[in-house]
């Protein structure tokens, strides 16, 4: 209330401001809520898919079916040819499961035959009659290894092989080798395990590689 004669002071009006319209604000709020709901739904769907993929991969990459060793024509060490994997193959040979070991090696770097103690200068049997052959698949991938072993099996008359690799690789390697060789494939774990810091990366890599192998078979 103002006294008689007092001047009424009005706040200056903004010449450049949009007029205040409650109806406009009422329309904006529902739109914003709708966008938020859609964003939350998309996030929820992405999380659900990630969980589903992770759960689906457990029996393939964390708890795969590992074959019981039995006598085969050759034991195949899949790359990279690390010491633990080679030693696992040598132990299987020492237990009488095969007299032939094939080690997949690269043509350069730390995985080249020249840098691997288990690779002999020739393929002559050792004192125990064990033949170790270090061969370069083209390309140096699981698919390349399967193609290489398929050709070896045809040339040597092999009917069975036992592949040695890490636990996350077993399911995919068995599938690819079985596709190429048509059967007679065993897959065993090298026993080396996976470091905790590498599990997420290995899981993602093997998942993508498994899907690729399903979509584009090797043989």
Predicted feature locations:
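Secreted/extracellular small peptides and ectodomain modules produced from precursors
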Residues: 12-15, 117, 132, 217
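N-terminal Lys/Arg-rich, disordered targeting/topogenic segments
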Residues: 2-37
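A transmembrane-helix-recognition feature enriched in membrane-embedded lipid enzymes
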Residues: 198-219
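Secretory-pathway extracellular proteins and peptide precursors enriched for disulfide-bonded cysteines
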Residues: 4-9, 110-115, 125-126, 209-212
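Short alpha-helical segments used as structural interaction elements across diverse proteins
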Residues: 32-35, 82, 209
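A structural signal for short, hydrophobic/glycine-enriched beta-strand patches
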Residues: 61-203
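Structural signal for membrane-spanning alpha-helices in multi-pass inner-membrane proteins
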Residues: 58-62, 81, 213, 217
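N-terminal type II signal-anchor transmembrane helix
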Residues: 29-66
């Amino acid at each position: 209330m103002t006294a008689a004669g007092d001047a009424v002071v009005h706040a200056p009006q903004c010449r450049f401001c949009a007029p205040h319209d409650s109806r406009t604000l009422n329309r904006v709020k529902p739109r914003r809520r709708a966008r938020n709901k859609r964003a939350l739904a998309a996030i929820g769907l992405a999380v659900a898919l990630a969980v589903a993929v992770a759960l689906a991969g457990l029996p393939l990459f964390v708890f795969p079916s590992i074959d019981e060793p039995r006598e085969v024509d050759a034991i195949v060490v899949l790359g990279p040819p690390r010491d633990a994997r080679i030693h696992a193959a040598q132990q299987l040979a020492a237990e009488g499961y095969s007299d032939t070991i094939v080690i997949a090696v690269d043509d350069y770097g730390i995985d080249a035959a020249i840098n691997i103690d288990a690779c002999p200068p020739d393929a002559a049997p050792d004192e125990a009659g064990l033949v170790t052959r270090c061969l370069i698949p083209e390309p140096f991938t699981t698919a390349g290894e399967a193609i290489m072993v398929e050709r070896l099996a045809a040339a040597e008359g092999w009917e069975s092989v036992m592949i040695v690799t890490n636990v996350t690789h077993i399911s995919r390697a068995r599938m690819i080798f079985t596709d190429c060789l048509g059967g007679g494939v065993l897959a065993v774990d090298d026993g080396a395990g996976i470091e905790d810091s590498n599990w997420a990366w290995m899981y993602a890599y093997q998942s993508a590689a498994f899907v690729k192998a399903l979509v584009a078979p090797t043989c």
